[in-house]
Amino acid sequence: MQHQDVAIIIPSRLSSTRLKQKPLQLIGSITLIERVFKQVNQAGLKHTYVATDSEEIASVIKKVGGKVIFTDSAIPTGTDRTYEAFKLIPNNQNINYIVNVQGDMPFIEPSSILKIIEYLKNSEYDIVTPIVKVDRESVEASSNVTVAVDSAGTALYFSRSLIPNGAEEFLYHVGMYGFRKNALEKFVSLKPTFLEKTERLEQLRVLENGMTIGTCLVENVPISVDTEEDLKKAVKFYENISKLGL
């Protein structure tokens, strides 16, 4: 298997504010978290784990041959859960890179994960995250995050507002992160920052503390499920691709 020094961790907490028991919601006949895991598993990495506080989620993943790490339900963020899970991976001293894939993207493309890893290994960035070029209409129709980058693709700022102001094309931020091990360790040791709390974006903690985030372009905006409306869209998308035999 490739990239044996990389661990992929999918944080998945049963409790959800806007969609009850979100990871166990069905898309077709398969739960959301199972779909995420199966997509991620197609990247072909040995060290792929679901980090959860739930026996129900663990049961779903184990039934399809996945590996589970139990983490405390009180852990505040997905990144903190990722780090706690990393510490529990057997022989984790051999892991140099950790990819955090959100547990709410049922159609995430394995190629995006591999691209993060390649960019991370072939750069000096602390963290690498994917972005997608989108037009104003696409991004205004969502509550998602845009990012401003420099000419080398280094992230300058992330915002829930459209940035840069006045543009017609934007960079949509996909919520996945590839960390160097020492960068993940440093991140969780830092206190939440002013900009992070203002924008409600924990990646700003990285930038405010002088760490670097590189971006890699991917083709498609993945569907994220956070609300009942998002779930309906995901089900509709699944029905459409099923009709096409994809």
From Swiss-Prot:
GO cellular component, one term: cytosol
A GO molecular function held by the record: 3-deoxy-manno-octulosonate cytidylyltransferase activity
Predominant localisation class: cytoplasm
Cellular compartment(s): Cytoplasm
InterPro entries: Cytidylyl_trans (IPR003329), KdsB (IPR004528), Nucleotide-diphossugar_trans (IPR029044)
Listed pathway(s): Nucleotide-sugar biosynthesis; CMP-3-deoxy-D-manno-octulosonate biosynthesis; CMP-3-deoxy-D-manno-octulosonate from 3-deoxy-D-manno-octulosonate and CTP: step 1/1; Bacterial outer membrane biogenesis; lipopolysaccharide biosynthesis
Homology family: Belongs to the KdsB family.
Protein's UniProt name: 3-deoxy-manno-octulosonate cytidylyltransferase
